[in-house]
Curated annotation (Swiss-Prot):
Residues 349-442 form the HD domain. Residues 223-289 form the KH domain. CDD domains: HDc (cd00077), KH-I_RNaseY (cd22431). Endoribonuclease that initiates mRNA decay. Residues 16-41 are annotated as: Disordered. One of its GO terms (biological process) is mRNA catabolic process. Keywords: Endonuclease, Hydrolase, Nuclease, RNA-binding. This is Ribonuclease Y. Its EC number is 3.1.-.-. It is an enzyme of class 3 (hydrolase).
Length: 533
């Protein structure tokens, strides 16, 4: 069996050998065939490449010849275009040169004509100079003759008139001065009339706008405070045994206590509103507590002093906030707050200052001026009224000195001292302060005046106008708001009437203190009377 297997193995090996030799033979044949095919393909490719190269060379030569022809055509066309442009430029330059030649020729002609004209004028001037020399000689001779004639005429005039030349000159100067004064007065009247018309319209518009934008309540205040009591029995406790309590209260506070038949009420009277307010607070605390005796009165009065001082500071700060002012010296704020308890003709001074500051700020804004200085000066313009009982002098001057002492701007100080014309106003802010003060205090119902001072003011107004020469009658009308002056027409002409109205108004403004404004009207009436018989 092993032998069979070995034979089969040898047979298989032989078969494998045969297959291998056959495969090698087939591979060699196939390789030869492929080589021949590749050689044939290579020859075909070389032939095709040669043909393509020949065609490419031919195409390149053709394109080169075409490009050369196109370049020659382009060069020729560009050369022609450049030649045409050069010809056009040359023609233009020739045209300009011909124009310049023409203008130069014209200018030369004008220069020649001007030279001839100048020569002609020189000849005329020489002739004129000769004529003037002759006339000057004649004028000198005539001037000498005229001088002699003038001297003779002057001597004759002096002989006829009985006046020397100096006296005649003085008389002539006086006549000219009178005429110039009359012309000046007429012109001043016309200028003032036009200025018043324009200024009145604008001022009316500004003031009306300011009043419309400021609406404030106003109540008249008096020098008496009323304190309500829980019962009439409290009046006896206020009086005390043998009047001990009421005497102690009046001596400590400086406030008079008026006890009458009015049920459940007592009156506190004092000209100083600050002391009256401290007395009211003191008595209110005593009545509420029920213990009324001299020692208790002193304690409550000390507490009332501190309370009123705090209220003054708070009132001053509230006024600054209301007006829109950021900073101010603490002492000025305190003095400003004290004005809360002071009145002027029944008008609360602090309320008047706040209202006036708003008015001044609005008017300054309408005039395109910074409102800060106007508001500040107007708010402080009555500052001196807080110290008029303690310092001598008018409240305007005192207030200005206080403001200057505490570092206020000089414009603010000037507005304070000039608001009653004790110092001549030199700035618009001072004039605005005056206007705001007059608007706030002069509107109906803002202030009240006593009958005695009112009558005295009317009498003085009529007296001021009656003292003028040529015045026939004077009438104070409309509660002293208008003065009508009747003049003698033979003594006062139209120009003098205008000057009289201005002088009377100025004197009233300088001498008197009054709310609002006063109109002075001068009436000059000429009557012609004829009798039919």
């Amino acid at each position: 069996m092993v032998a069979d297997l070995r034979r089969e193995a040898r047979d298989v090996e032989e078969e494998v050998e045969r297959i291998r030799r056959r495969a090698e033979q087939d591979a060699a044949e196939q390789t030869e065939r492929v080589r021949r095919e590749a050689e044939q393909i290579r020859r075909h490719a070389e032939e095709a490449a040669e043909a393509i190269r020949e065609r490419a060379v031919a195409d390149a030569e053709l394109r080169a010849s075409r490009a050369e022809a196109a370049a020659r055509d382009a060069i020729h066309a560009e050369r022609e275009q450049i030649r045409a442009e050069l010809d056009e430029d040359l023609r233009t330059q020739r045209t300009e040169l011909r124009g310049w030649d023409s203008r130069l020729t014209q200018r030369e002609q004008r220069v020649t004509d001007q030279a001839a004209s100048v020569e002609e004028r020189l000849r005329r001037l020489e002739t004129r100079e000769a004529e003037l020399a002759v006339r000057e000689a004649g004028l000198d001779s005539r001037e000498s003759d005229l001088g002699e004639l003038e001297e003779a005429r002057r001597r004759e005039l002096e002989r006829v008139a009985g006046l020397t030349s100096a006296e005649a000159r003085t008389e002539l100067v006086k006549v000219v001065e009178d005429q110039a004064r009359l012309d000046a007065a007429v012109r001043v009247r016309d200028i003032e009339a036009r200025a018043e018309e324009e200024a009145e319209d604008r001022a009316r518009r500004i003031v009306t706008l300011a009043i419309q934008r400021v609406a404030s309540d106003q109540t008249a205040e008096s020098v008496v405070s009323v304190l309500h009591l829980p019962s009439d029995e409290m009046k006896g406790r206020i009086i005390g045994r043998e009047g001990r309590n009421i005497r102690a209260f009046e001596s400590v506070t400086g406030v008079n206590v008026l006890i009458d038949d009015t049920p459940e009420a007592v009156l506190l009277s004092c000209f100083d509103p600050v002391r009256r307010e401290m007395g009211r607070i003191t008595l209110t605390a005593l009545v509420s507590d029920g213990r009324i005796h001299p020692h208790r009165i002193e304690e409550e009065y000390a507490r009332a002093e501190r309370e009123v001082a705090a209220k003054c500071v708070r009132a001053g700060e509230d006024a600054l906030i209301d007006v829109g002012i950021a900073e101010m010296h603490p002492e000025l704020i305190n003095l400003l707050g004290r004005l809360r308890y002071r009145t002027s003709y029944g008008q609360n001074v602090l309320a008047h200052l706040v209202e006036s500051a708003h008015l001044a700020g609005i008017m300054a804004a309408e005039l395109r001026l910074p409102p800060a200085i106007a508001k500040r000066g107007t708010l402080l313009h009555d500052l001196g009224k807080a110290l008029t009982h303690e310092v001598e002098g008018s409240h305007a001057i005192v207030g200005a000195e206080i403001a200057r002492r505490y570092g206020e701007h000089e414009d603010v100080v000037h507005a304070i001292e000039a608001h009653h014309n004790e110092v001549e106003p030199r700035s618009i802010g001072a004039v605005l302060t005056q206007a705001a003060d007059q608007i706030s205090g002069g509107r109906p119902g803002a202030r009240r005046d006593s009958l005695e001072s009112y009558v005295k003011r009317l009498e003085r107004i009529e007296q001021i106008a009656a003292e003028r020469p040529g015045v026939e009658k004077v009438f104070a009308m409309q509660a002293g708001r208008e003065v009508r002056v009747m003049v003698v027409p033979e003594l006062v002409d139209d120009v003098a009437a205008h000057l009289l109205a201005r002088d009377v108004a100025k004197q009233i403004e300088d001498e008197l203190t009054y709310p609002g404004q006063i109109r002075v009207t001068v009436v000059r009436e000429t009557r012609a009377v004829g009798m039919a018989r």
